[in-house]
């Protein structure tokens, strides 16, 4: 089955996560393991809709695209993926998500303007100015799980 594209409607849940994860250009052969760790953590979420945007066309981007496709095909009831959401749909979607998860600059730049939590995974956005709504973590299962728990805790 093909991935649902931008014409399909997002079925929002009580909890919603937007995932945008790109390979890190200067890190060779790390994208697959890092993204598998993210998928492991996302799989632990209950009653949560996961909205993926496809990665850019960096060297290991096709690996991540395949992992997303496989995940969505196995988890149709709780996930959807977009090759491109377009600016309007992307910004409109931010209104309904609890967090942006991944390593995209939009989590650092746009999300804080909307007062949306960002889980920034790894070093892709290293040394960028960040708002108070950004949680940084290593691309490791336990750290990602801890960051996701923090998003839904009353402390954050």
Indicate where each model-derived feature is located.
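Nucleotide-activated sugar donor-binding and catalytic core shared by glycosyltransferases
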Residues: 1-156
């Amino acid at each position: 089955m093909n991935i649902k594209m931008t014409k399909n409607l997002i079925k929002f849940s009580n909890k919603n996560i937007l995932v945008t994860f790109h390979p890190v250009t200067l890190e060779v052969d790390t994208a697959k393991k890092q993204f598998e760790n993210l998928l492991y953590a996302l799989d632990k979420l209950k009653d949560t809709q996961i909205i993926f945007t496809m990665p850019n066309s960096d060297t290991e981007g096709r690996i991540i695209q395949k992992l997303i496709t496989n995940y969505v095909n196995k988890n149709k009831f709780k996930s959807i993926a977009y090759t491109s959401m377009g600016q309007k749909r992307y910004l409109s979607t931010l209104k309904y998500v609890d967090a942006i998860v991944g390593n995209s600059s939009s989590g650092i730049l746009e999300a804080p303007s909307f007062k949306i939590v960002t889980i920034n995974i790894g070093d892709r956005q290293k040394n960028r100015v960040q708002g108070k709504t950004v949680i940084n973590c290593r691309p490791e299962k336990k750290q990602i799980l801890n960051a996701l728990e923090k998003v839904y805790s009353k402390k954050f």
